[in-house]
Amino acid sequence: KKKKILIILLLPLIYQSVPTEILKLKIFDTFVKKQEPSGNFVILNITEQDVENEGGYPFPRKTLAQIQVDLINEGAIGVGWVISFPQADRMGGDEVFAQTLGYVPSVIAMFEDGKGNYPKPTGTVVKGSHVSGIVSMGVKENLNTLKDNTLQGLAIAPTEVDQLVRRIPLLVSTPNNNWIPSFGTQIYKALFSVKTYIIKTNDNGIEEISI
């Protein structure tokens, strides 16, 4: 009887072990279908050659403003910058960059810093019981000049136990039960001029998010 009890007690530990969790993730991977590019989104990387051409990094905000204008002239209906701008530009280009961010729906990134500060909560409607989701320990916001003229979203990509990224949260919660939108969620919100998130929950957590 003692052996049977011991085996039963060990089963949850085995099921939650790292090798077992990795196996579960690999099985999950087999069910994920490869998605073909839609052609609606384009990723533009800043390369080492770009940095060399500009004489170093970070680029002056006036240069970023020109890039923003160039993208718009090439047909972009929205621009997302996966770069944060918490400090003022020593070259004095924040005003012109902020102006160009307002030409089309735009989003700039925020990143976690663990210092317990958070952006002002946005409009959120929760249908169902409260759930916490992924909790952030602090976010570094962007410069007021920029964030007041565009949207900012949290760039976060937590890894699984095998150090691969499979899931990117749409919203992240704070210890005081507010919600921080992710970068991708803000892109959608900007393009469709949405003001409020509707979060539907169930016993398992967040069921769906409507924007």
Q: Which residues are covered by each model-predicted region?
A:
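Non-transmembrane functional regions of envelope-associated proteins
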Residues: 1-211
